[in-house]
A protein has these predicted regions:
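Conserved serine DD-peptidase/penicillin-binding transpeptidase domain
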Residues: 1-147
Length: 147
């Protein structure tokens, strides 16, 4: 894609009203085995959150894949300090949010896979963001986004 001359749109009309499979319930989120289903998926509707310890009592390194500004990361972890408590990687799923929070002790590298709320929006938002980062030419000056 070199440029967009009109509206960039994504059609998710192939989705029915049941975005969780039969037998699944609201409390199965934010786990990766139960992503929100959509015809548009990126990384199975999930984010891989990898943490690695740094120097004792400092913030651990957090890397999320795929990288996107669709979600936020709050790093409250502590490196190599058992008094910080058990490592916990989660998102604010009860409020249907996409704020990923790392807390507790990080004593060794670890990766957790979390689903994101509204995987179709995650796909399209990340797609458009990557187009813009590649300096996609927009004609006219604005590129409307419809989902």
């Amino acid at each position: 894609i070199r440029y967009v001359t009109d509206t960039l749109a994504a059609d998710v009309s192939m989705t029915d009203s049941v975005y969780w499979g039969s037998g699944w319930c609201w409390d199965d989120t934010p786990y990766s085995f139960q992503p929100y289903l959509s015809p548009l998926m990126l990384n199975r509707g999930c984010v891989d959150v990898s943490v690695s310890p740094a120097q004792k009592d400092s913030l651990p390194q957090v890397v999320c894949t795929p990288a996107s500004d669709y979600y936020q990361v709050h790093n409250h972890g502590v490196s190599r300090n058992p008094q910080a408590g058990k490592l916990k990687i989660t998102r604010n799923w009860l409020s249907n949010g996409n704020i990923i929070t790392v807390s507790g002790n990080v004593s060794y590298p670890y990766t957790e896979k979390l689903n994101v709320y509204t995987s179709k929006d995650f796909f399209f938002h990340t797609f458009v963001s990557r187009l813009r980062s590649k300096e996609l030419k927009r004609e006219p000056a604005r590129m409307p986004i419809v989902l």
